[in-house]
Curated annotation (Swiss-Prot):
The RuvA-RuvB-RuvC complex processes Holliday junction (HJ) DNA during genetic recombination and DNA repair, while the RuvA-RuvB complex plays an important role in the rescue of blocked DNA replication forks via replication fork reversal (RFR). RuvA specifically binds to HJ cruciform DNA, conferring on it an open structure. The RuvB hexamer acts as an ATP-dependent pump, pulling dsDNA into and through the RuvAB complex. HJ branch migration allows RuvC to scan DNA until it finds its consensus sequence, where it cleaves and resolves the cruciform DNA. InterPro entries: DNA_helicase_Holl-junc_RuvA_I, Hlx-hairpin-Hlx_DNA-bd_motif, NA-bd_OB-fold, RuvA, RuvA_2-like, RuvA_C, RuvA_C_sf. Belongs to the RuvA family. The gene is ruvA. It is found in: Cytoplasm. Residues 1-63 are annotated as: Domain I. One of its GO terms (cellular component) is cytoplasm. The lineage of its organism: Bacteria, Bacillati, Bacillota, Bacilli, Lactobacillales. GO terms for biological process: DNA recombination; DNA repair. Residues 148-196 are annotated as: Domain III. This is Holliday junction branch migration complex subunit RuvA. Residues 64-142 are annotated as: Domain II. Residues 143-148 are annotated as: Flexible linker. Homotetramer. Forms an RuvA(8)-RuvB(12)-Holliday junction (HJ) complex. HJ DNA is sandwiched between 2 RuvA tetramers; dsDNA enters through RuvA and exits via RuvB. An RuvB hexamer assembles on each DNA strand where it exits the tetramer. Each RuvB hexamer is contacted by two RuvA subunits (via domain III) on 2 adjacent RuvB subunits; this complex drives branch migration. In the full resolvosome a probable DNA-RuvA(4)-RuvB(12)-RuvC(2) complex forms which resolves the HJ.
Length: 196
């Protein structure tokens, strides 16, 4: 079982990235491959979950341990496999997902790929309260997280005003989720990624 991999990001495709370490290239399936586009040929650390099947050993990768924890919680629900869990992470900001589960918002959950009403109900039943328990978040840490997200949102709005497309910024935003930077730092780092 692998916890993480550290190596050079050598390739990006629509479904996976390749990280090279010790002369081997590892295919790693991630939610938003192009969110790594600013790090091609640079060293990266990717958190991992391995799925062993009869016909393949698959690696699923994540920007942060929190994103990995959300993935593990999702695949614990009957009817949600690794591919569906990645698709959910790819189209959501994670906060919306957690809020929908804790508030029993079936309508919100059924917007995700391959999630019908029955699976949404199962998600609520199995996962309500789990994300806070898993991360050990207190009211204070949630407040800090909210402030960090506010800085990121403000930076994304500034980049929109500069003429960048929402589709471009979604990939950039996904990369910076869970980080703690000032608005100016987010803008500077985002521009560096967007201009490559």
């Amino acid at each position: 079982m692998y916890d993480y991999i550290k190596g050079k990001l050598s390739k990006i495709t629509a479904k996976f990235i390749v990280v090279e370490t010790a002369g081997l290239g590892y295919v790693i399936y991630v939610a938003n491959p192009y969110s790594f586009s600013g790090y091609v040929n640079q060293e990266v650390t990717i958190y991992l979950h391995q799925v062993i099947r009869d016909d393949a050993h698959l690696l699923f990768g994540f920007h942060t341990e929190n994103e990995k924890e959300i993935f593990l919680n999702l695949i614990s629900v009957s009817g949600i496999g690794p591919t569906t869990a990645l698709a959910i992470i790819a189209v959501d900001d994670n906060e919306g997902l957690v809020s929908a589960i804790d508030n029993s918002d079936i309508k919100y959950l059924t917007k995700f790929p391959k999630i019908g009403k029955k699976t949404a109900q199962q998600m609520i039943l199995d996962l309500s309260g789990k994300f806070v328990e898993a991360s050990g978040e207190s009211a204070t840490s949630r407040k800090v997280s909210s402030e960090q997200n506010s800085n990121l949102e403000e930076a994304m709005e500034a980049l929109l005003a500069l003429g960048y497309k929402a589709t471009e910024l979604k990939k950039v935003k996904a990369f910076f989720e869970g980080t703690n930077e000032t608005v100016e730092q987010y803008i500077k780092s985002s521009l560096k990624m967007l201009m490559k």
